[in-house]
């Protein structure tokens, strides 16, 4: 089905990308359509990219402060670093949950109810 393929392609493309948080949010809402191992693998790719970005932000901020750049000019860099830390913490917890085979996933999690499917369809409109 073309619609399903479109969704899966989007999930595969957007989860590892850290520069597009809104698109990643949409992809995360559909990650349940992937096999567990594939979902965990994509999330680990994202984790690596986020960790690298966090290191870059923290290192850049530290260097700027060491050179005497006033903190007031680095507020956004600080904010971005804190947001990256928060996302990394959440993502690592999510990966641990999904990697645990006791965590229901796919068919083992049960089928969505008709009410859920209707609400999901209404939200798309």
Q: What role is predicted for each listed range?
A:
Residues 1-8:
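Basic, amphipathic "hinge/linker" alpha-helix immediately C-terminal to the N-terminal HTH DNA-binding motif
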Residues 36, 43, 70-73, 77, ...:
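Amphipathic alpha-helical coiled-coil segments and their boundaries
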Residues 57-60, 64, 91, 98, ...:
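Hydrophobic stripe of amphipathic alpha-helices that form coiled-coil interfaces
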Residues 58-79:
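Acidic interhelical loop/turn segments
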Residues 8-62:
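Amphipathic alpha-helical dimerization/coiled-coil segments
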Residues 97-113:
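Long amphipathic alpha-helical coiled-coil segments
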């Amino acid at each position: 089905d073309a619609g399903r393929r479109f969704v899966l392609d989007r999930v595969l493309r957007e989860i590892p990308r850290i520069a597009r948080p809104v698109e990643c949010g949409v992809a995360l809402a559909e990650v349940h359509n992937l096999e567990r191992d594939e979902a965990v693998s994509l999330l680990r790719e994202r984790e690596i990219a986020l960790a690298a970005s966090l290191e870059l932000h923290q290192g850049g901020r530290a260097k700027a402060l060491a050179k005497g750049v006033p903190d007031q000019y680095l507020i956004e860099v600080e904010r971005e670093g804190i947001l990256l830390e928060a996302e990394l913490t959440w993502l690592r917890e999510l990966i641990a949950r999904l990697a645990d085979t006791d965590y229901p996933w796919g068919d083992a999690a049960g089928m969505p109810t008709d009410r859920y499917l209707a609400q999901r369809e209404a939200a798309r409109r």
